[in-house]
């Protein structure tokens, strides 16, 4: 603002009103961090400030002695004394002061209309200007400025309320975001066992947390305590889990080392049936023992598997050798059957003798593959039946059939005894031999009786 020209005097020329001199300094409010609201539409209709063209002659007069008067709707008042020039200079000087005041009002209107200022500060500035108008040393339409300042105060109050509502809405939204993040962190802390993914998510929550501002300090502190407590709970659970995992791995290692020793002790066994069952039991124990550390677990498994492979390779080789032997036995019995089918039935005694020789060879050959045993036995029984039922030349057929039946039963029990012996069923083998001996005795007695009747 321009200073007064030389010769102007009066108490009003040294006042500190707007348009007259610098306002009294007031403490600047301490800035508080506040959320930055989203762009908002103008809350009041734009006020287009008129150009500073107020005619000072319409709103004042200058007395011959230099006294300057302001004319308002409520009357006249002295605003100063002018002795620095002619009357027009006084009008020009005090008119410029009004123009400066008008410019300040227009600036407040523009800031309020465009939303570029804090409505509370605009209201405070407008109130200060309105308070200074009754003593302002200006010539112009002060009543119009007063009306415009009243409008600014009203509109600024409404704008301040809107801003407050927006701040409250923004603060509530930001608080809700942190509420949701705190609740998610608490759920992770209480329930999650996906340790890596959960730990990563807690770090992501923290990164997002730091971007959320504008909360009330008390609410923000309370939510931070919830998140921090959840993170500590999760870290304790995770630490306990891995400590327990380490303990279980040590236990699993000890158990599997013992299983390896037991497996290695069985590796050279030739008791194929019992040892196969033992290895199945060991494998079940292995699966139930849990896992050691990966490298340790892999090494122990290779050790266990090596012992297992040693045994089963030997068993498979023995079975292959046995199968080859049984196959050769089947071929030998095929040859005996072919020989038996060629026996001459015209001489019954000779036929029976030949069949007995074949039966002895048959029993001496031993076992055949399981799938061939029934077939070969059935063919031999058919040949025995054919020889048994052949005409006997004067011998009682029923007595002869009975003697043959006794002999067949004896042979049947003898074969049962051999099978039981091979299977390790000693008691069954002894019982079968005893039955065979009894039937053999009866068969011999029947044969002697037939000889006497010839």
Swiss-Prot record:
GO molecular function annotation: DNA binding; RNA binding
Biased composition (Basic and acidic residues): 397-433
Signal peptide interval: none
Induction remark: Constitutively expressed throughout the cell cycle (at protein level).
Keywords assigned: DNA-binding, RNA-binding
Region (Disordered): 1-60, 390-454
Bias type Low complexity, positions: 41-52, 434-448
Pro residues biased stretches: 24-40
UniProt key word rRNA-binding: no
Disruption phenotype: No visible phenotype.
Assembly and interaction partners: Monomer. Binds ribosomal protein S1 (RpsA), RNA, ssDNA and dsDNA.
Protein name: Uncharacterized protein MSMEG_2731/MSMEI_2664
Organism: Mycolicibacterium smegmatis (strain ATCC 700084 / mc(2)155) (Mycobacterium smegmatis)
Taxonomic lineage: Bacteria, Bacillati, Actinomycetota, Actinomycetes, Mycobacteriales
